[in-house]
Amino acid sequence: MNANLPPSAISELHGPRLLLRAWRDSDREAFAEMCADPQVMEFFPSVLDRAQSDALVDRVQAHFAERGYGPWALELPGEAAFIGFTGLFDVTMDVHFAPTVEIGWRLAPAYWGRGLAREAAETALDFAFERLRLPEVVAFTTPPNRRSWGLMERLGMRRDPAEDFDHPLLAADHPMRRHILYRVDAARWAER
């Protein structure tokens, strides 16, 4: 894996409709609104307050500075300056499939159902396999999150129920502790 790409080499990716770009300070307000929205955060342990949301943006920016990739801010040119994020995260927690790279996404509800999460994820996966030369990318979510795992399947990711896991950062009795794991490798991605 080439994790030493200069951030300038990947500060922007272009999809047919979307711009995946570096985060701006002006994104923080819209992101905080998303993270405080119970609909957006339905399958996360809790909504985030402004300080927690800003701290997440800070971690994203630090990840980019350190690794040369991360979750990009999503812009829909001509329509919206910020609609959410999609991108790549290092998985370092204590799970059987780590260390690896995860793809994740979060969009404002006004942009759901338009194929934008899929477009952004395809753009990020192209980057993961073509530029970073990753052997595999994973994604995971809670079983009730059909929208998310449905997208994983539409992306060609595959699930093996034997690999499902309990999220180590959630309490043993937390209702969202159980997670399902999807994978796609470079060869499968190239075949699509």
From Swiss-Prot:
Q: From what superkingdom does this record's organism come?
A: Bacteria
Q: Which residues hold CoA?
A: W105, R106, L107, G113, N145, G150, L151, M152
Task: List all disulphide bridges recorded for this chain.
Answer: none
**Its EC number(s):** 2.3.1.-
- Establish whether keyword Transferase is in the entry: yes
Q: Which SUPFAM superfamilies match?
A: Acyl-CoA N-acyltransferases (Nat) (SSF55729)
Q: Which Gene3D superfamilies match?
A: 3.40.630.30
Which residues are the signal sequence here?
none
One of the entry's Gene Ontology molecular-function terms is: acyltransferase activity, transferring groups other than amino-acyl groups
Q: Where does the record place the N-acetyltransferase domain?
A: 18-187
Question: Keywords assigned by UniProt?
Answer: Acyltransferase, Transferase
| Any Pfam family | Acetyltransf_3
Stated role: Catalyzes the transfer of an acetyl group from acetyl coenzyme A (AcCoA) to an acceptor substrate and releases both CoA and the acetylated product. It prefers the peptide Asp-Phe methyl ester (or aspartame) and the peptide antibiotics polymyxin B and colistin. Other substrates like dopamine, serotonin, puromycin, chloramphenicol, D-glucosamine, glycine and N-alpha-acetyl-L-glutamine are used and displayed lower activity.
Provide the protein name: Acetyltransferase PA3944
Q: Which organism is it from?
A: Pseudomonas aeruginosa (strain ATCC 15692 / DSM 22644 / CIP 104116 / JCM 14847 / LMG 12228 / 1C / PRS 101 / PAO1)
Could you read off the lineage of the organism from its UniProt record?
Bacteria, Pseudomonadati, Pseudomonadota, Gammaproteobacteria, Pseudomonadales
